[in-house]
UniProtKB/Swiss-Prot annotation:
It comes from Polytolypa hystricis (strain UAMH7299). This is Cytochrome P450 monooxygenase polC. One of its GO terms (molecular function) is monooxygenase activity. The keyword Transmembrane helix applies. Belongs to the cytochrome P450 family. It is found in: Membrane. Its main location: membrane. Polytolypin and biosynthesis intermediate compounds show antifungal activity and can efficiently inhibit the growth of the pathogenic funfus Candida albicans. Pfam families: p450 (PF00067). It catalyses: motiol + 3 reduced [NADPH--hemoprotein reductase] + 3 O2 = 4beta-carboxyl motiol + 3 oxidized [NADPH--hemoprotein reductase] + 4 H2O + 4 H(+). It comes from the Eukaryota.
């Protein structure tokens, strides 16, 4: 009898469990269907109102359109290609369009017009998209400058600005030259060896060393030896995909939080004693313009009655770690990729290369071995290289490293040149830099590399459209480090380009790997940008490097 009762109780418990599971599944399905209906009906309403968008399916939304486009692109092609690909497929969508890919993302309003992008970044600054914060959280804990809004953001942005000003960055050029010299020595060894190597990897290490100097006045020596902080930060970035990827499997990777915690511990173990020492001695550097010192000085001034640093508050220590990690990430990632693309563009356009080398001979003298010494003595000479600036800007036009994602507000509309008002409420609003920079409606000879467009006057057909160039975004929340990035790109190119010829080796690399080249291009471009934070050259840009022969430098 007792056994019978026990079996009955077990059967009852099992039935309750099955009922609970069934109920949870029913609730989950009902919730999913409700959200699906809400997303699709919202977009169908916009479609009925004449809002611009590709063909919309009542059940699948724009998922078939997006899937078809990405089916034609190579693996890991950057997500920001979608805007230009949609424009090519539907030429009438040449200013903005809505996309509905729920459950892979919220309803989106994609802008590829300078005028429309300026309306929500310059005329009014919409709040940052929550996905950006989710992406950065494992790295910074959501306490960084990018994640801030309102008064906190204004306060700290004002404190950071002097550290990234043009004059301050120019003063740091002599220190930056040291890291570029190390980089030059590494590239020279590859030139002598004649091997194929991924150019972006040593470039990333150099950029990390430079941003370490600018932020902390600290030598990471990432180019020469293993550094635990930079290694952990790069590894953490590889695992920071939540918020920017649409793959739902990214959300159920059980290893992710473990890796995040481990890398955070590695970074904090390196940073904490370094920051503690800088904080305790900050008053010994009253005129320091290093970014870390600026943050600490502002905090001491506001929180210490006698103006002297006391014990570092744990909350402020966490805040400091967040800013340093953010600046290290932002200061090396996209800049390194842009340097590589600048070399690539010059390789593909020998006339521009010859003109640039001639300008550098004029500004720094014909002795290429003296370039570094000249820059250390007269760093302001870099600003006299007008064609170098034009080359840099044109490269960033063709290969913008990021885009801008904001979130719409009730009652806020974007208005196109025809007077059409597009609602932003409940929408991810994107200024797609790649789509804007490659839009033939706004750029004559849009796919051509033409540094000259940055040197002509307003009456010339090539003169850039107002607000059209936005690799660092525009408006109050533009990239804080754009002056550093532009200076670093120009500095590296000025030192390297007269000594080395850098040629991509994709054909050899593909042959060696047995890859079918026809499946590895975007708009005919093999060095297409891939998703890894910002846009990076595919496969880290395999290349060969050779030394420039004397006859190559005999420029008429």
């Amino acid at each position: 009898m007792a056994v019978f009762k026990l079996d009955a109780l077990r059967a009852i418990d099992m039935s309750k469990l099955c009922f609970a599971i069934s109920l949870l599944c029913a609730v989950a399905i009902a919730t999913f269907l409700h959200k699906l209906y809400k997303a699709r009906s919202f977009m169908r309403r916009l479609q009925r109102e004449g809002m611009p968008m590709p063909p919309h399916h009542w059940l699948f939304g724009h998922i078939p359109v997006v899937a078809k486009i990405f089916g034609t692109l190579p693996p890991h092609a950057h997500l920001f290609f979608i805007a230009d690909q949609v424009r090519q497929a539907y030429p009438h969508l040449d200013s903005a369009f809505y996309l509905d890919i729920w459950p892979f993302g919220p309803p989106s309003l994609m802008t590829i017009s300078p005028e429309l992008a300026s309306q929500f970044t310059q005329d009014k600054s919409l709040p940052k998209y929550e996905g950006v914060r989710k992406f950065l959280k494992p790295l910074t804990g959501k306490k960084d400058l990018v994640s801030m809004e309102g008064h906190d953001w204004k306060h700290w942005r004002a404190n950071f600005n002097p550290g990234f000003s043009a004059s301050n960055i120019t003063n740091m050029i002599p220190a930056m030259v040291q890291d570029v010299q190390t980089y030059r020595d590494i590239i020279r060894r590859h030139a002598v060896a004649g091997d194929i190597f991924p150019l972006e990897l040593p470039t990333l290490a150099m950029s990390m060393d430079i941003i370490g100097r600018v932020v902390l006045d600290h030598e990471f020596n990432s180019q020469k030896a293993y550094n635990p902080l930079t290694s952990a930060l790069i590894d953490q970035l590889a695992w920071c995909t939540i918020g920017v990827h649409s793959n739902p499997l990214e959300y159920i990777n059980i290893a992710r939080p473990i890796v995040h915690q481990y890398n955070a511990w590695r970074m904090n173990s390196y940073l904490d004693p370094l920051l503690k020492l800088r904080y305790e001695t900050v008053n010994q550097r009253p005129k320091s313009k290093y970014v870390g010192d600026l943050i600490m000085s502002a905090y001491v001034k506001e929180n210490s009655p006698d103006g002297r640093p006391t014990k570092m508050d744990p909350v402020f220590a966490e805040f400091m770690r967040a800013q340093v990690k953010l600046f290290l990430q932002a200061g090396h990632d996209t800049t390194a990729a842009s340097i590589v693309y600048t070399f690539y563009m010059l390789q593909k356009h020998p006339e521009s290369l010859r003109r640039l080398r001639k300008e550098l001979d004029t500004v720094f003298g014909p002795d290429i071995t003296a370039t570094c010494d000249v820059l250390k003595e007269k760093p302001q000479l870099l600003s006299q290289c007008n064609f170098l600036l034009a080359v840099t800007k044109e490269t960033l036009r063709l290969y913008p490293p990021t885009s801008t994602a904001r979130f719409g507000l009730p009652g806020f509309y974007l208005t196109d040149s025809d007077g059409k008002r597009m609602p932003t409420e409940n929408c991810l609003v994107v200024a797609n830099h790649h789509g804007i920079h490659h839009n033939p409606r706004f750029w004559p000879r849009v796919e051509e590399f033409l540094p000259e467009r940055w040197l002509v006057d307003e009456s010339h057909p090539l003169y850039p459209v107002k607000n059209g160039w936005r690799p660092f975004e525009r408006g109050s929340r533009n990239c804080l480090g754009q002056e550093l990035a532009m200076t670093e790109i120009k500095l590296v190119v000025a030192i390297m380009i007269r000594e080395f010829n850098i040629h991509d080796a994709y054909a050899e690399n593909d042959l060696e790997k047995g890859q079918r080249e026809k499946n590895l291009r975007v708009n005919g471009e093999r060095a297409y940008q891939i998703t890894r934070g910002g846009g990076h050259p595919s496969e880290n840009f395999p290349c060969r490097v050779s030394l420039v022969a004397n006859k190559e430098r005999e420029i008429p």
